[in-house]
Amino acid sequence: MAAFEYQQAEEIRDALARHGVRYLFIGKSGAILLGFPDTTQDADLFVERSPGNGAALVSAIRELGFDLTDAQAAEIVRGKDFVQLKSGPFDLELVFAPDGIERFADAWARRVDVEGFPVCHPDDIIASKAATNRVKDRESLPRLRAFRDYWASRRRG
């Protein structure tokens, strides 16, 4: 399994933009786009839950080369909380209800634009990792918090 790469993020951004999908990069892939020095095996997307957005996402994912089953497409359209896709050119995790984030609209209002990539704010990435409470997420929290503080200080100037 290959690591998440910038080119994959570009392909995702461009395909989802062509189909008008509302989403945010979240998780470690989102942190990496913000400059966090780490690797991950997949792209994590927080997707706005609505039938229209889900249908647009299915079209975009198929355009990217994913071989979706009818059941997977239906899960995406209805906004199943979590959909993991390994049937394409890279691994993709779609999260419609991430732990630690109440509403997509709130995360969207706090988003950070990085070269046209809509990315969850570091505070939201941290909140989600903390709420998930997996060992690997707990282990990364101190580094993510230190990065967030560094990132915030650089933005202030």
Whereabouts are the PLM-identified features?
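Compositionally biased terminal segments of proteins
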Residues: M1-G157
